[in-house]
Each structure stands twice: as C-alpha cells, then as structure tokens.
Design a protein with these regions (language model features):
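Basic, polyanion-binding surface patches
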Residues: 1-200
Length: 200
C-alpha cells in the first residue's frame, strides 16, 4: 500500500504510523511545580539522542484532543527547568497505565497509582522509587514541532540503577524487562536479546 501523510488516505480503520515506528521506549516523566505539587505521566515518543554528554528527548502534545493546552509535565518543566525519567518495567505496567489518565492538578498520580517517590539529588523533581532505572534531567531546550506538539530535550545529570539489575558489570535489561509502546493499544516486553559484532 501507499499513502501520503498530508491526506492520510491509507483506508485503514486506524492510522498505522505509531505501529510502524515501534517499539518505542516509555519515558515515565516526573515533574514538580513551583507550589511543590508533583506530576507523573508516561510518554512514548521518547529516546536517547546522544551519550556524551547524555541527552534524552520526548514529545509532548496537547493535554486533550482538540484543546491546545500544554500537559502538566510540560508546564512544570518550563517553570522549574528540570524533570526525571523513570523506565517502566513489566512489573509496573499497570501503574504506568493508571498514571496515563487525565487527572485534576490537585490530584497526585503517585498516590492514585500506588507508587512512592524519591527525591532527586541534582534536580527538584522526584522519580519513581519502584522503577529499575531513573534519570535526573535538566531542561536543555524545547522545540516547537509542526502541528501541536513540543519536543523536550533534557541533559541527564544523574542516573539511578537498582543494583540487582547490574550483572557482570552490565545493566541486564532481561532482568527487569522494560516494556515498549507499539501501535494501537499494544505493548511489548523486552525479554530476549542477542549480540551482533560490527564489521571491522
């Protein structure tokens, strides 16, 4: 099949784009506002951009379809200049899904999802205590994309890794089984890996 994205004339029941760009790691973004209220939400347009210095980025759309209003995560990052990213393991998939709901500013996603938060060391934002890996980030830039989304770029200033997932000097993702976003309502669990040597 062939279709143009300007018209989206694919003829399918659902737009296949998110299923094509998959699997995508999930950034569990934790922020805090100037009043000390925390926010937690998952974002699947997320990835590392470079490793020296470590830079990550994630895309944030409007809070609701048809409403051009930024999500709490983006508003808090603009206000404080920092945030944390926690990686979602298979064991935390249900809590992550709960935190994806639309809640009033006064409600705490950590409490709603039954999670605890740990205080950041280099940033004011907390991170998910139960997560296998968390990154503390300082805002580097926010880029306005075509349409209604923003691309948030963060400099990673500190890394938290639970010791039980470091095996023989390497982070073993098969031990904590991170989940990834696919298309539609689909997710995947990373449970099997293999190595390939680069050509010399």
């Amino acid at each position: 099949m062939f279709y143009t994205t300007e018209v989206n004339d694919h003829g399918l029941k659902y737009n296949p784009f998110k299923a094509i760009v998959a699997p995508r790691p999930i950034a569990w973004i934790s922020t805090i506002d100037n009043e000390g209220r925390t926010n937690l939400a998952p974002y699947s347009f997320f990835n590392g951009m470079q490793d020296s210095p470590p830079i990550i980025g994630f895309g944030s759309g409007p809070s609701k379809v048809g409403i051009d209003e930024p999500k709490d995560s983006l508003s808090n990052i603009k206000a404080t200049g920092n945030f944390c990213v926690s990686i979602v393991s298979e064991a935390l998939k249900n809590q992550m899904n709960i935190s994806s709901g639309h809640f009033p500013h006064s409600e705490n996603e950590y409490e709603i999802a039954g999670l605890t938060q740990s205080k950041g060391v280099t940033v004011s934002a907390p991170f998910v205590t139960e997560a296998p890996v968390s990154l503390e980030c300082k805002l580097h830039d926010i880029i306005t994309l075509p349409g209604t989304s923003k691309w948030v770029i963060g400099l990673v200033t500190a890394v938290h890794i639970k010791d039980e997932f470091i095996i023989n000097g390497k982070l073993d993702i098969t031990k904590y089984r991170p989940i990834a976003r696919l298309g539609y309502k689909d997710y995947a669990t990373i449970s099997q890996v293999y190595e390939l040597d680069r050509p010399k």
